[in-house]
A protein has these predicted regions:
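Beta-hairpin "wing" of winged helix-turn-helix
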Residues: 50-54, 83-92, 98
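C-terminal all-alpha effector/ligand-binding and dimerization domain
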Residues: 6-17, 122-246
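Short, hydrophobic-biased segments on the C-terminal half of alpha helices
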Residues: 78-79
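Short, cationic-aromatic polyanion-contact patches
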Residues: 35, 59, 96-110
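Extreme N-terminal segment that seeds HTH/winged-HTH DNA-binding domains in transcriptional regulators
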Residues: 1-69
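N-terminal leader/targeting segments and the immediate start of mature chains
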Residues: 41, 82-83
Length: 246
């Protein structure tokens, strides 16, 4: 969970089991719409790590042979996966598993852009990193039991030296068992990239609510604004494969 306080040719047929085509064979879909079942099977392979973030997945022809379906069915499934940012098409190269280490991925959840439209990368300063018991509201959002271990992170993100975001993150302690303040300070890439590469957890989508708030004393001090200053509060829950909140 990532609250930020101050800021679908179904042919109607089933497919038989398919032989391997350059990759480990998996079960074939047994009900329609067919392309949705192919999409689900490809997603299972992504989730299991058969194809890792940044890796090239089999071609549409190979996947069609693997699942005994038409190439058009595979293409439609991949189109949806690309629209959901699970894979990326690269002209002349093929389709790759999406990764948070891609430059464009950095702004998928952090949707801040200056007036001139050129993305700026924030600097982060960690204020607090600790392991504690999940409060009831956090446990509910993360589908945990009240009192389960969570990692709490508070940081300030600045653009061009101006503190802009005070961010609080609550992460399931079991998944992020080895996450420490020292590792966060050492790591220089996007935080979601760290979660992906070192903890095997990829953020797939997010549910977000935004509301207007007034700055409190603590957050105001971190943002260098007076208490009562109007701010935007974004409350976000991120989900990984299987729609599991993380």
């Amino acid at each position: 969970m990532n609250p930020v306080p101050p800021n679908q040719n179904s042919n109607g047929a089933s497919a038989p089991a398919a032989p391997s085509s350059g990759a480990a064979a998996g079960p074939s879909p047994t009900f329609s719409p067919l392309y949705q079942q192919i999409k689900a099977l490809i997603t299972q392979s992504l989730q299991s790590g058969e194809w890792k973030p940044g890796e090239l997945i089999p071609s549409e022809v190979e996947l069609a042979g693997r699942f005994k379906v038409s190439q058009g069915t595979v293409r439609k499934a991949i189109d949806e996966l690309a629209a959901e940012n699970l894979v990326m098409r690269k002209q002349g190269k093929g389709t790759f598993v999406a990764t948070h280490h891609e430059e464009r991925a950095h702004f998928r959840f952090l949707r801040l852009m200056p007036d001139e439209g050129v993305p700026h990368y924030p600097e982060s300063k960690f204020i607090e990193v600790k392991r504690l018991r999940a409060p009831a509201d956090v446990a509910r959002l993360l589908d945990l039991k009240s009192g389960d271990s969570v990692v709490y992170i508070k940081r300030v993100q600045s653009f061009d030296g101006v503190p802009t975001i005070v961010e609080e993150l609550w992460l399931p302690g079991l998944i992020f068992k080895g996450l420490t303040a020292e590792r966060l300070n050492e790591y220089k890439g996007p935080m979601y990239g760290l979660f992906e590469s070192e903890f095997g957890t990829r953020m797939i989508r997010a549910a977000e609510k935004i509301r207007a708030v007034c700055a409190g004393e603590d957050d105001g001090a971190l943002l260098k604004v007076a208490p009562g200053t109007p701010l935007l509060c974004s409350e976000r829950v991120s989900f990984t494969y299987g729609d599991k909140p993380v």
